[in-house]
Amino acid sequence: MKRAQAPHNPLLAELKAVHGMLRRDLAACRQLAIAAANGAPTAQIRSGIKQLQTRGPLLQLRSNCIRHCHTVHAHHEGEDTGLFPTIRRAAPHMRATIDRLQADHRVVSDLLDQVEGVARNLQNTGDSRARLVDALTTLSTHLLAHLDFEEKALAPILLTMKARPANG
């Protein structure tokens, strides 16, 4: 028996597209940090960075990590100020879910701040690169679980929404 495919919903599609970008960019930054920490040849690091449309290994690794963190912060701020208040009004039964997602946002925000701090102080030393790998690994564990939970939890309500919620 074939399962019916869920109808296309632009809000859910956008959420998944943004989450896909966040996953992809986080994985790229993390892989570059691991490669640098493991002493990968500069050419390999440059090649990975070029895929992120940048140049200059450690400087650009730092820049990409910081930019990724800012993107996630902005995405979560948009959810906290626009999407989540709309869902609270439209689906009061989802209050506990929204509370959990906002608590996750606070944890992820702290982890993003840690990654940013380590990235800003990134030096051409094994210890410095290892700290970035550790920070990105911890962020990955929490952020990827959060993204998966959020998509599953919000899909039913997003499928009922016709337009993007306004912020505020």
Protein language model annotation of sequence segments:
Residues M1-G168:
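Small-residue-biased structural context
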